[in-house]
């Protein structure tokens, strides 16, 4: 178990860490294995859970978008280790490989994929709040019986789960600070933070809360 921590859904749900054998690793650097390898492992785990008749929630963190931005050679037209743009393009490549494989699986039709950046408290430095560094995309993919749409609202990562649960039409009780961004009464705002400061942003104005 991952340090005994539970899940956002229930303390009864435990986080299990999966080790990856060396034979399943084609490329790695100081941060970990390449995106293709971790996605392949995710599919293997999903296959086993489906075969065993168990639902699954797989959480994956990719490593390519970290310095020195290295990844397997011959995958894209930007040499490994030269730029962040190359790392992002490789991740795009790896995601395409993931979805090409996932679509062939029997569990795909009942599986929702969420892709989002994982900005941490230090992403904008220790002191200044650089708003541009917190502007990130999020994708909700393969949501059953939902039409594609592009949402351009000022919101935060904390709003992700309430929005997803709303799309599922789930009724639940929680201590979430986030809100459903698709709700008619959603008030646009964003929370930003570093190790030292927490800020609230509304439209073009930013207020330091602490």
Describe the residue ranges of each PLM region.
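Solvent-exposed soluble domains appended to multi-pass membrane proteins
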Residues: 1-210
């Amino acid at each position: 178990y991952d340090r005994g921590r539970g899940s956002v859904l229930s303390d009864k749900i435990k986080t299990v860490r999966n080790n990856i054998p060396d034979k399943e690793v084609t490329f790695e650097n100081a941060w970990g294995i390449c995106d293709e390898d971790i996605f392949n492992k995710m599919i293997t785990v999903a296959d086993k859970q489906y075969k065993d008749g168990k639902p699954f929630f797989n959480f994956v963190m990719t490593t390519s978008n970290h310095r020195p931005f290295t990844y397997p050679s011959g995958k894209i037209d930007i040499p490994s280790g030269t730029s962040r743009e190359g790392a992002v393009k490789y991740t795009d490549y790896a995601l395409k490989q993931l979805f090409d494989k996932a679509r062939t699986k029997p569990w795909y039709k009942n599986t929702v994929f969420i892709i989002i950046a994982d900005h941490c408290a230090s992403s904008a430095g220790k002191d200044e709040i650089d708003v541009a560094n917190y502007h990130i995309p999020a994708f909700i993919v393969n949501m059953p019986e939902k039409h594609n749409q592009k949402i351009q609202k000022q919101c935060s990562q904390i709003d992700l789960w309430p929005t997803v649960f709303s799309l599922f039409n789930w009724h639940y009780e929680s201590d979430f600070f986030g809100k459903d961004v698709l709700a008619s009464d959603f008030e646009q705002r964003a929370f930003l933070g570093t190790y030292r400061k927490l800020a609230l942003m509304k439209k073009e104005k930013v207020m330091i809360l602490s």
